[in-house]
């Protein structure tokens, strides 16, 4: 089960990539592979490149045909409800799950509009239980709250989202059987160049 960046990694893992392959992929990926900047209109990033990248990596395998069961979480911005993608286009589901409000343009699928799943379910422990998981291992990658004044629009958005995620995550993490907390809290959501450091951790 993956939310936001977790859905990105989760989709690749569910397709069959092992930890070594995922690490190699993360080191080789460039911003230009997944980030398509656009004139701000509900977001700075379109998300089309991310969708295409995921579909290419999973050989266009739909969610329901993954080697390992996989579920991506997004938020229906119209109703505020948690949406679980359990079938269909994997790249589209991951794009919807990763659509950080104000950064990515919201993802429209079948008349509904979706944003980042972390808005309502940053860790998705309850979803994992609902879909039959006996043991839930959660990964907490929340950033340390920055006490500095944000520099610019993107910093303001990301800092606000980090605060929101931290508040919601704490309750969900308490319901996991095991919580892994890699020391990556000092790495901001937009610090793509620090991915090597995050992987080593």
Locations of the language-model features?
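Patatin-like phospholipase
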Residues: 1-3, 11-201
């Amino acid at each position: 089960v993956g939310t936001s960046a977790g859905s990105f990694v989760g989709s690749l893992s569910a397709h069959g990539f092992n930890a070594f392959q995922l690490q190699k992929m993360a080191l080789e990926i460039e911003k230009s592979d997944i980030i398509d900047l656009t004139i701000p209109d509900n977001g700075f990033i379109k998300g089309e490149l991310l969708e295409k990248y995921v579909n290419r990596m999973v050989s266009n395998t739909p969610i329901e045909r993954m080697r390992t069961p996989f579920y991506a979480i997004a938020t229906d911005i119209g109703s505020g409800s948690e949406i679980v993608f359990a079938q269909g286009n994997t790249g589209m589901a991951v794009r919807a799950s990763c659509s950080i409000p104000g950064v990515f343009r919201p993802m429209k699928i079948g008349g509904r509009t979706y944003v980042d799943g972390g808005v309502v379910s940053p860790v998705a422990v309850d979803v994992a239980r609902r879909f039959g998981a006996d043991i839930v291992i959660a990964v907490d990658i929340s950033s340390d709250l920055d006490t500095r004044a944000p520099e610019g629009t993107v910093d303001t958005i990301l800092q606000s989202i980090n605060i929101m995620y931290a508040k919601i995550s704490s309750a969900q993490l308490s319901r996991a059987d095991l919580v892994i907390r890699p020391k990556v809290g000092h790495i901001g959501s937009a610090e793509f160049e620090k991915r090597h450091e995050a992987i080593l951790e």
